[in-house]
Amino acid sequence: MRGCLQSVRWLTTALRRPAPQLSCLPFQPFASTSRLFSSCASRAATAARKPPSELEQRIAAIPIERFRNFCIVAHVDHGKSTLSDRLLELTGTIEPGSNKQVLDKLDVERERGITVKAQTCTMLYNYKGEDYLLHLVDTPGHVDFRAEVSRSYASCGGALLLVDASQGVQAQTVANFYLAFAQGLELVPVINKVDLPSADPDRALDQMKSSFELDVEQAVLVSAKTGLNVKQLLPTIVEQIPAPVGDHTKPLRVLLVDSWYDTYKGVILLIRVFDGEIKAGDQVVSFATGKKYIVGEVGIMYPNQTPQTVLRAGQVGYVYFNPGMKQSQEAKIGDTYTKVGSEKLVEPLPGFEEPKAMVFVAAYPVNSDDFPHLEESINQLLLNDRSITVKKESSEALGGGFRLGFLGTLHCSVFQDRLQQEHGANIIITPPSVPCKILWKSGEETVITSPIDFPDDDSSRMKVEEFQEPYVLTTLTFPQEYLGKVIELCEGNRGEQVSLEFFTATQVILKYQLPLAQLVDDFFGKLKGLTKGYASLDYEESGWRKSNIVKLKLLVNKVPVDAVSRVVHTSQVARLGRQWVTKFKEHVDRQMFEIVIQAAVGNKIVARESVKPFRKDVLAKLHASDVTRRRKLLEKQKEGRKRLQAVGNVIIEHKAFQAFLSK
């Protein structure tokens, strides 16, 4: 009883006390937007007021004259990521031998040994008693990710031009050199893999001198794998690569270089600060969208996200907003940001050219019930890669799916791997196709990306003036001994020779105009096979050309299978049609009636195969001499099969489509 009375007294006393003043108030419906905006900004600024770390104090003491922003540029598999690891180890950013390919963060990058996303890292290097702030960008080498490379150059003042001592200058070395040269980057020649038995550094240096007119006397010969001579690179970077230009006293001007999505923080932006300073609590505005944001956190990649109090002019780092940017479409690559109120004082920076999808595939879930999961998985990956185009599509054979556009075939393959590895999506992918342009007699133009939309009936084709397909200018480098075979391959793929150059006694640079449709049809695989893996390839868009293209369809019992249709050149129709019907026959189960598989262009059948039906022995119980009864039963069975074929649906398992569409 006494305990109950004490509880009542305690409760009465508590109720008489004044309510505590809460520091963080709940949502007030009558509060003005500006009050809420300023209160969020003040809270973010208060949260950012922490004592600076030793790293921050060292960075704060470094003037912009001792900043160096650089990237590593090379052909695929010439050792960019391995060299990045050695530089990070030498500057104390990571522990020696702690990780391989630190900047290759995706599983597919580690598995394939390639770089897909450009990654950044900040390093501190003490040279002659003074600290230098080095900012490294590890760029992709493959042509499909050219947009990643060109964006990376915008945040750099120089580049290490890396060449494999055993392979020499390759096609993408040439392409990436011209990209860097056009942006005015200071180039430092570096020869890698000098420890290999097949290494020939002198030949590689001669190629760099003759191809790029670089001063090879300043070249550094290294082995990124063993660490040989890598220490000599750091003084070379400090002495040869210029400091960034910027003024931290001017109004804020930052360039959005890249972005990625974080589940908890929303969209995180990778920025290059050209002028001014940016810190948590600042209110910034986008020139592209006009939307305003409050900076929640700024920091550098060291090599992971490391928060900082402020980012100054010349630095490259990350920023995310509070409240977070939830729609990745708001983060437009190449956009300029400044502080609210400084819009008229700042000239926006020139942006980047938007990458265009050049290769299209259709993706369908193996199980139609998994469509929502596939859609969610694709949307998650799009947050980190907005160069992919997505359009919903429906197929009678495979159900709901998506028409996806990519920068190239490797880009498509990497996306498929990420869907399966990171999201467990089990999908059916159609062979890659390219867009085509239709010029109508009415004067209109239409670009179609799906074979389903291609006009193949007579009435539609009568309205067409001409069809066009995209061409690319390809640059191939390979040993001279394979010249005849490579020319034969290019000519067999409707190519037109542009130039032929012997840039050393044994190496050839061959340029061809090729239809993009031929290039995506495993051209690179055939090229590698012909040259025993010694060839390299690079390409760039070369416009549209008139072409005699048609839509090739697959018919099963006279019903078109829309998921398998494809736009091809007339010279390929007979060969491809024969391949289709032969391969599809292997994967279709027998039915109670005959299945006719045909390849057709319009109303013309170009190839045919048939799957024989199961046969029931209706004569088993008859006497051998009963000829009349025997004939009657056989005729009845024949009529029954005709009726079944007329009304029966051919059941084709999804596994059959998956096997047929695979290489």
Swiss-Prot record:
Instruction: Report the family membership.
Output: Belongs to the TRAFAC class translation factor GTPase superfamily. Classic translation factor GTPase family. LepA subfamily.
> Under which name does UniProt file this protein?
Translation factor GUF1, mitochondrial
Q: Which residues take part in binding GTP?
A: 74-81, 138-142, 192-195
User: Does the keyword field hold Transcription regulation?
Assistant: no
Give membrane topology per the record: Peripheral membrane protein
* InterPro entries found in the cross-reference section: EF-4 (IPR006297), EFG_III/V (IPR035647), EFG_V-like (IPR000640), EFTu-like_2 (IPR004161), G_TR_CS (IPR031157), LepA_C_sf (IPR038363), LepA_CTD (IPR013842), LepA_IV (IPR035654)
Q: Does the keyword rRNA-binding apply?
A: no
Instruction: List each coiled-coil range.
Output: none
**What would be one Gene Ontology cellular-component term for the protein?**
mitochondrial matrix
Tell me, in a sentence or two, what this protein's role is: Promotes mitochondrial protein synthesis. May act as a fidelity factor of the translation reaction, by catalyzing a one-codon backward translocation of tRNAs on improperly translocated ribosomes. Binds to mitochondrial ribosomes in a GTP-dependent manner.
Q: Which PANTHER family match?
A: TRANSLATION FACTOR GUF1, MITOCHONDRIAL, TRANSLATION FACTOR GUF1-RELATED
EC number, UniProt record? 3.6.5.-
- Say which species the protein is native to: Coccidioides posadasii (strain C735)
